[in-house]
């Protein structure tokens, strides 16, 4: 699936139906509202000088941490585009606050001591979640508002704290890459890491191994939901025809949607995908598809205008 980018402001619409999805058990990160726009272009600019300064600052921090006898902690990143190091100090955010104030819908008020430490260095905090005996805080140095409430996040990082002390930092291979955005907790104690694109996708899972190693690895093949009573396969970025088959293999049955004059929904129904429930005619072209299983209801959301659109995320309402 080609990643979506746009600079067209488009027309805003009522998104109360889609916004409601974020109030249940969700695979989506805390993210921008789903507003509409009519075209996609690749015009999100990067601040190269700002990014270079940030990367240099991180390099100095890593070097200093290695020389000051920080606690021994094994950290492993299995992802080629995200690095992770044991560190003991966090650099200040580069640039000025104006680089981070254009996407308030992505920024949270820091509440934990760990998140407050990050905010005190000038970073925009996006997520603050438990990670076993640790705490993971994602934050960014630059946020670029895109169309209809969407946002492109760069200079994203994940700080890992233990007893309110910084012990590790995950960061992208370059400051201009939207490699890291928000975080969502998973059943079992792991944390899902999302990218910072305007239509976010998960990039990996952060977990604590039995020996205490912090490991950032690829997205799991399946997620346990509803206290382990059901499984959801990894259908991210999968076309809807393949995703519905993968869901069926895990016991999720399609729920027939209602009649709709929306052309894309009608076309999906003609293809035999009768669970298409609603489609946005403009913007990121979200469509929802409903399923039911022994543990509850699942709503799959796709993005894009392909005849068979690709999965952006899912939401589960447990019984």
Locations of the language-model features?
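Extreme N-terminal basic, low-complexity initiation segments
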Residues: 2-11
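Bacterial N-terminal signal peptides that target proteins for export
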Residues: 32-53
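N-terminal signal peptide c-region/cleavage motif recognized by signal peptidases
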Residues: 61-64
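Exposed acidic/polar residues on beta-strands and adjacent loops within beta-sheet cores, strongest
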Residues: 67-319
């Amino acid at each position: 699936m080609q990643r979506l980018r746009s600079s067209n402001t488009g027309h805003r619409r009522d998104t109360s139906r889609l916004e409601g999805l974020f109030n249940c058990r969700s695979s989506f990160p805390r993210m921008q509202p789903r507003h509409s726009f009519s075209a996609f272009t690749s015009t999100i600019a990067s601040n190269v000088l700002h990014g270079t300064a940030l990367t240099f600052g991180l390099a100095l921090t890593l070097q200093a941490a290695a020389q000051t006898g920080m606690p021994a902690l094994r950290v492993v990143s299995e992802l080629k585009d995200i690095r992770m190091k044991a560190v003991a100090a966090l650099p200040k955010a580069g640039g000025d606050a104006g680089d981070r104030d254009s996407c308030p819908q992505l920024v949270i008020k820091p509440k934990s001591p760990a998140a407050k430490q990050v905010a005190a260095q000038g970073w925009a905090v996006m997520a603050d979640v438990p990670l076993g005996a640790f705490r993971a805080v994602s934050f960014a140095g630059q946020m670029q508002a895109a169309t209809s409430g969407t946002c492109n996040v760069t200079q994203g990082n994940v700080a890992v704290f233990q007893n309110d002390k910084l012990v590790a930092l995950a960061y992208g291979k370059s400051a201009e890459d939207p490699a890291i955005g928000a975080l969502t907790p998973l059943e079992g104690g792991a944390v899902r890491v999302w990218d910072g694109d305007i239509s976010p996708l998960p990039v990996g899972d952060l977990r604590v191994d039995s020996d205490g190693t912090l490991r950032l690895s690829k997205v799991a093949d399946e997620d346990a939901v509803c206290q382990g009573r059901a499984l959801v396969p990894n259908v991210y970025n999968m076309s809807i025809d393949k995703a519905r088959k993968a869901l069926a293999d895990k016991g999720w049955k399609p729920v027939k949607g209602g009649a709709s004059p929306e052309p894309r929904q009608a076309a999906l129904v003609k293809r035999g995908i009768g669970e298409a429930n609603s489609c946005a005619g403009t913007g990121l072209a979200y469509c929802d598809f409903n399923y039911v299983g022994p543990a509850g209801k699942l709503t799959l959301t796709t993005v894009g205008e392909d005849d068979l659109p690709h999965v952006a995320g899912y939401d589960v309402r447990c019984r």
